[in-house]
Regions:
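Beta-propeller-forming repeat regions
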Residues: 2-6, 11-287
Length: 287
């Protein structure tokens, strides 16, 4: 086998000092490439609930999950069976992994059957929210979501999906509780769960100016999400989760203090006179 090559960060000066706390080892054959290949543990193909699907690596973020000064990778696995919010149909299960840069799998979160898979649904944030030097993960969850240690959020027996193939709601989740959960970066253990703000109702209240278009009653507009991290008080980070891309947009800001998610404020453009009403956008920018 080819010997590994170790690379270190050094400080320039009269007496260079090697920073032995941060290093990266590459195979000799890889040292000339301008990137680091990180092996992933791809989930097995699934045949369940009448669905067959495989997984592919999707959105990713980085954060120092264990406080050692090095980044870890947090990766969303996208099933091949996904849907956009307006379309009926069942989806596969949405998974989120955490890896070290050498490919060690730290944990896997399974969001469960009550979180639909698709680009518009799961927005996850990775950031050190409480200032302890370790990043947390925050995302929307539901009954049956399972954390990185095997703990189940909510009621594991509940299946809130519409299972009638003839219904315009087929495969959609327009009933049941919705949650916002924060997970420990080192283990993937859920630290706190709160009721998601806002809820999805009324289903026909998200299109048109002020959400009064009454042009969608099947969750196509109610189930579109964005999210970001913002220093709202200029000192500590908050998370902002947004629901609605069209007529009505609701932004909910949360702080994570002493192990608890705490609502900071909620902005709602549901009034037609609101200048932010009807300002359709599929993205969130924070500056």
């Amino acid at each position: 086998p080819e010997p590994a090559q170790a690379y270190y960060v050094t400080y320039s000066g009269e007496t260079p000092i090697r920073d032995s706390g941060n290093s990266s080892k590459l195979r000799a054959s890889q040292a000339n490439t301008p990137y680091l290949s990180v092996p992933l543990q791809k989930p097995e193909a699934v045949s369940s609930d009448g669905l067959s699907y495989t997984y592919s690596a999707n959105d990713a973020s980085v954060g120092d999950l264990d406080g050692d000064g090095s980044y870890e990778i947090i990766l969303k696995w996208q099933p091949s069976k996904v849907q956009n919010p307006p379309r009926p149909g069942l989806t596969g299960l949405q998974l989120i992994d955490a890896y070290t840069l050498d490919g060690t799998l730290l944990w896997r979160i399974n969001l469960g059957k009550n979180i639909r898979a698709g680009a518009a649904y799961t927005q996850f944030l990775v950031y050190d929210l409480d200032g302890d030097g370790k990043a947390e993960l925050v995302c929307k969850t539901a009954d049956g979501s399972t954390d990185g240690t095997g703990n189940v959020i909510g009621d594991a027996t509940k299946d809130w999906r519409n299972l009638d193939p003839k219904s315009p709601f087929y495969g959609k989740i327009v009933k049941g509780p919705e949650y916002l959960s924060v997970f420990e970066g080192t283990t993937g253990k859920v630290l706190d769960t709160q009721i998601y703000i806002p809820n999805r109702y009324p289903l026909d209240g998200w299109g048109g100016i002020g959400g009064n278009g009454n042009n969608d009653a099947t969750g196509g507009r109610a189930d579109r999400f964005t999210a970001g991290v913002a220093y709202l008080n200029g000192k500590k980070p908050s998370v902002v989760f947004v629901r609605g891309w069209y007529g009505r947009t609701v932004a909910a800001a949360w702080d994570f203090n002493k192990g608890k998610l705490q609502s900071r404020w909620v902005f709602d453009s549901k009034d037609a006179e609101n200048p932010f009403s009807g300002q359709a956008n599929h993205q969130l920018s924070i500056g």
